[in-house]
UniProtKB/Swiss-Prot annotation:
Name this polypeptide is given: Condensin complex subunit 2
Lineage: Eukaryota, Fungi, Dikarya, Ascomycota, Taphrinomycotina
Biased composition regions of type Polar residues, renumbered to the chain: 53-62, 452-470, 592-604
GO MF annotation: an example: chromatin binding
Gene for this chain: cnd2
Compositional bias per record (Basic and acidic residues), positions renumbered to this chain: 21-39
Compartments where found: Nucleus; Cytoplasm; Chromosome
Amino acid sequence: MKRASLGGHAPVSLPSLNDDALEKKRAKENSRKQRELRRSSALHSITPRRESLNNSSPFNSSHQVPVLSNFEEWIKLATDNKINSTNTWNFALIDYFHDMSLLRDGEDINFQKASCTLDGCVKIYTSRIDSVATETGKLLSGLANDSKVLQQTEEGEDAENDDEDLQKKKERKRAQRSVKTLVKDFESIRAKKFELECSFDPLFKKMCADFDEDGAKGLLMNHLCVDQHGRIVFDSSDTVIKDLENKDVEAESQEAVVAAPIESHDTEMTNVHDNISRETLNGIYKCYFTDIDQLTICPSLQGFEFDSKGNLDVSLLKSLSDEVNMITTTSLVDNTMEKTDADAASLSSDSDGEEGHIVHALEEMAYDEENPYVDVVPKAMDESENPDFGVDTEVNMADGSTMNENYSIISTAAANGVYEYFDKSMKKNWAGPEHWRIQALRKNINNASTVFNSSNTAESSDNVSRSLSSTERKKRRELDNAIDFLQEVDVEALFTPATSSLKLPKSHWKRHNRCLLPDDYQYDSKRLLQLFLKPKMSVLPNADGEGQLQLNKALDDENDLDGIQPHGFDSDGSDNVDEGIPPYGFGDSDSPKQTPLLTPPSSSGFGDNLLLTARLAKPDMLNYAKRAKKVDVRVLKEKLWKCLDLENTIKENSINSHIEGSEMESEETNMPVKSFFSTVNQLEETYEKKELKDISTSFAFICVLHLANEHNLELTSNEDFSDVFIRPGPNLTTLEALENDV
């Protein structure tokens, strides 16, 4: 068997599994084909340049339809802002912009389409620039990363050393920059002048808020106030702190501030304020309040003790004097002792008496009008509460006489009872619900003594039997009045007129207010310190204290007490509250000689509450809707001038005065007179109702003032200032009026 020779057969070629060169070749071919396709698509979409308008062929017209469709699609995407860096290279709108045939509508150019194409071209151009920038950035970043990787692999140690050197250089540069940025002098940064242009004045803001466009309410003078010195100021609710006039006090306060120890910044400020306040208060005390311990707030009530539960209404308190106390205490003690003895005798009944009589007697004592001191005198006479009661101690009176201390205790206690009654029951100048309260009826003393006297038991038993018999008779009479239904009804007896009538008698008809409560005036002494028209504004006392000090020094002299006149109300009816309160009561019967021990007042207030500086209460503003009124002032002036109808008279007078000369000027011509009230009423004929609502009298008067300045009119008011009369003024001859007439 012959062996086949190997030379006649071709060698077998095995394909390589990973051929990099072949793969690169295929990738290049694919990319080349894609580029050709893109170029061909772009070239097909571009219209060929027309050499002339006349050289038009059916071939060009056939290609015009896809070009227009692509153009409209690209414009739509451009207007919708759908062009970005990824699809910007697929639009060929920039290449078609030079072709004006796409922008024409017949013979005219569609500028709206041209503006849209220009906007789209700008968007495509900017997006292409962005895409180029991003692609180049990616390329540069990739190259930089590759170079860094190669440097790290090849030069590992050298790269670390270079990085350390770079970090050291950066640290050195930062240190140098920190020195440059710091400011050596702080004064260069400090703001010397504050920018106050943007800030607004709160008073100006309030004035603008209160401004009213309607008329005179919005004027500036109507929003200003007058202070106690007569100055016109804004309505600010800040308290004014007056500077001290005593320079010595200021010097002492400054020395105290300098000598004060300073530990820190915070303690320094607190010590300064403390020293200033103490020194100023000491100086004020030395100047004004040196003799404050010897003064009394209200000398007429010096020996009076107020009740904690009662009302301290000064208008209801009566000034007490020593001689009046002597007169009242004697009668008061006699009356109270008699009444208390009688009441005690009525209460000292035997144990066999009923409890109802005792309760009735207590009610009598409680509601007895002639004995208002029952609840006060027993307390003063109680020996357990007053251990010194009964000891005969004498008190020297002003006139040299003596008075027992027991009587003085009873008198002061009785006076307390009087004022407690007035404070609780009559503090509002009327009885209130107690006016209709049913009070217990008084019984005769003989009947009470026969019932409660244990000595006359026989008489009491007879009276009791009589009372029982009377009650039995009444019950029998009530039982005898039985109705018999079997008897015939007497018609005449049924219809007989009754003796008693249901109507009120005629005597009560005139007194129709007899069953009504009295008028509730609710008088209060604080009304003396308030204004009538502005009740929230209180009259402040004399804050200066200059004239008041001299008055107090004159009054404090004990030798001149007899010459002091009572500080009552003036004869002309004017009561000046700032000059002080009448120290001897409101009546004319009190005189200064009756109260020699009482010192005159040195303060001008009713109590401690009025010593504080009271702020002026701001009235509550009503929140109401404001509507801006729109008035044409020029039209209003024209209509008012027509209503006045003075133009013809002015022209006639000017012509006559020009012709006749000075003789006509000297004579007084009878000028027509128009009233402001009538002219304003004539506006109703020219304006509609809606427009007339916006026109106020202030607007009309302002327009009349303008007309008076322009046409030389004379304004005069009547006697009661209720109306203004308008007439032409003198010397109205002008050359301009004559030229206009000619």
